[in-house]
Amino acid sequence: MNPVNYLYLAALLFTIGATGVLIRRNAIVVFMCVELMLNACNLAFVAFSRLHGNLDGQIIAFFTMVVAAAEVVVGLAIIVSLFRSRHSASVDDASLMKL
């Protein structure tokens, strides 16, 4: 398959994720859409890496996955804390949390 097709797929996935972040109000769905956007960026990095014949994009994608794993841990902890205190996972309730 042509690497340009992977770039089209990455653009489509990123657009779906960005639309989900802008439209949805549930924190878990927004969080999943952000992860979809990160995976679309990883796909673009790997496609550009394959297109140019070097490993730089694949290394960046690997480190992005490591950072995304840490983000999942912190993000889900915040969402669980929000749900326990407000009994809702709405993004609008996040502004009511105390520091």
Curated annotation (Swiss-Prot):
Described function: NDH-1 shuttles electrons from NADH, via FMN and iron-sulfur (Fe-S) centers, to quinones in the respiratory chain. The immediate electron acceptor for the enzyme in this species is believed to be a menaquinone. Couples the redox reaction to proton translocation (for every two electrons transferred, four hydrogen ions are translocated across the cytoplasmic membrane), and thus conserves the redox energy in a proton gradient.
Where, per UniProt, does this protein localize? Cell membrane
Q: Which family does it belong to?
A: Belongs to the complex I subunit 4L family.
Where does the protein principally reside? membrane
Q: What residue stretch is flagged as signal peptide?
A: none
The organism is Streptomyces avermitilis (strain ATCC 31267 / DSM 46492 / JCM 5070 / NBRC 14893 / NCIMB 12804 / NRRL 8165 / MA-4680)
Q: Which reaction does it catalyse?
A: a quinone + NADH + 5 H(+)(in) = a quinol + NAD(+) + 4 H(+)(out)
Coding gene?
Answer: nuoK1
Xref: InterPro entries: NADH_UbQ_OxRdtase_chain4L/K (IPR001133), NUOK/Mnh_C1-like (IPR039428)
Q: Name the UniProt key words of this record, in alphabetical order.
A: Cell membrane, Membrane, NAD, Quinone, Translocase, Transmembrane, Transmembrane helix, Transport
Q: GO annotations under biological process?
A: ATP synthesis coupled electron transport
Q: Which chain regions cross the lipid bilayer? A: 3-23, 28-48, 59-79
Cellular component aspect of the GO annotation: NADH dehydrogenase complex; plasma membrane
Which EC class does it fall in?
translocase
What is the official name of this protein in its record?
NADH-quinone oxidoreductase subunit K 1
Under Enzyme Commission nomenclature, its number is: 7.1.1.-
